[in-house]
């Protein structure tokens, strides 16, 4: 087994047994909204599982809760449960969007970069809900993030993760949705440079969404590709 939190394999069965936890979790701190425009989110004082079953083929909802709920203290926590060949697709049209072929690149280019824009690299992250999982390979996690930016501005973000798990409790595939406008505004306001500066050494072509010019295949430039 790859995860210390797995309890055991059922003998003679392909099901995975995860540590039993109550069907509700009551230790969540109330969310304190920093939004100028919204009242405090209608966030429950305790987390209720749609399916509290822990005798599961894949991962149970209580196990998913324990795995993802620590992201506020450790941004890397999510990727501790990533398969080495995990593929991540960040949906939308913004600097984080794209298809990542390994978890390390996805983490550095998104969560790590975003975390560096937040004061003291601290963020309050909570789960709104968990759907699916258990005997289904796919699960959906709804997150709410709350922090203060390096410039002292209140910051909020809601994110949706759609995850495919294997029978060892590792994530094999992720599609995630974020607020593109919030991401772009946060990077623009809090990064000293926006993807590049005169201190960056460029060794790869970065032509933008339009791709390389047609002349690239007719000159020595084409031989370098």
Curated annotation (Swiss-Prot):
Job description of the protein: Dimerizing cyclase; part of the gene cluster that mediates the biosynthesis of the antihypercholesterolemic agents phomoidrides which are dimeric anhydrides. Within the pathway, tstC produces the bicyclo[4.3.1]deca-1,6-diene core of phomoidrides via the dimerization of the monomeric anhydrides leading to prephomoidride. The pathway begins with the highly reducing polyketide synthase tstA that catalyzes the formation of a C12-fatty acyl-ACP, starting from one acetate and 5 malonate units. The hydrolase tstM is involved in the release of the C12-fatty acyl chain from phiA.
Cross-referenced SUPFAM superfamilies: NTF2-like
Pathway: Secondary metabolite biosynthesis
Protein name stated in the entry: Dimerizing cyclase tstC
Entries under InterPro entries matching the protein: NTF2-like_dom_sf (IPR032710)
EC number, UniProt record: 5.-.-.-
Transmembrane segments: none
KW Glycoprotein (keyword) present: yes
MF-aspect GO terms: isomerase activity
Reaction catalyzed: 2 [4-(deca-1,8-diyl)-2,5-dioxo-2,5-dihydro-3-furanyl]acetate + H(+) = 2-[(1R,8S,14R,15R)-11-hydroxy-14,15-bis[(6E)-oct-6-en-1-yl]-3,5,9-trioxo-4,10-dioxatetracyclo[9.4.0.0(2,6).0(8,12)]pentadeca-2(6),12-dien-8-yl]acetate + CO2
Residues carrying sugar: 146, 195, 217
Signal peptide: 1-19
Biotechnology and industry use: Phomoidrides A and B (also known as CP-225,917 and CP-263,114) are potent inhibitors of Ras farnesyltransferase and squalene synthase. CP-225,917 and CP-263,114 inhibit Ras farnesyl transferase from rat brain with IC(50) values of 6 uM and 20 uoM, respectively. CP-225,917 inhibits squalene synthase with an IC(50) value of 43 uM and CP-263,114 with an IC(50) of 160 uM.
EC supergroup of this enzyme: isomerase
Family the entry assigns: Belongs to the dimerizing cyclase tstC family.
This protein's UniProt keywords: Glycoprotein, Isomerase, Signal
């Amino acid at each position: 087994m790859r995860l210390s939190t797995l309890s055991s394999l059922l003998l003679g069965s392909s099901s995975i047994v995860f540590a039993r936890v109550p069907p509700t979790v009551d230790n969540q701190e109330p969310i304190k909204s920093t939004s100028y425009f919204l009242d405090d989110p209608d966030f429950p004082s305790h987390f209720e599982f749609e399916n509290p079953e822990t005798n599961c083929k894949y991962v149970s909802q209580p196990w998913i809760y324990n795995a993802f709920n620590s992201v506020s203290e450790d941004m890397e926590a999510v990727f501790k449960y990533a398969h080495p060949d995990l593929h991540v697709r960040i949906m939308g049209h913004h600097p984080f969007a794209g298809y990542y072929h390994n978890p390390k690149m996805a983490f550095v280019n998104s969560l790590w970069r975003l975390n560096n824009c937040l004061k003291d690299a601290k963020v309050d992250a909570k789960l709104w809900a968990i759907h699916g999982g258990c005997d289904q390979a796919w699960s959906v996690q709804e997150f709410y993030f709350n922090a203060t930016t390096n410039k002292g501005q209140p910051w909020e973000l809601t994110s949706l993760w759609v995850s495919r798990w294997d029978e060892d409790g590792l994530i094999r595939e992720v599609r995630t949705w974020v607020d593109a406008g919030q991401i772009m505004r946060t990077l623009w306001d809090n990064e000293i440079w926006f993807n590049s500066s005169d201190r960056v050494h460029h060794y790869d072509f970065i032509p933008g969404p339009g791709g390389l010019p047609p002349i690239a295949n007719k000159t020595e430039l084409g031989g370098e590709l």
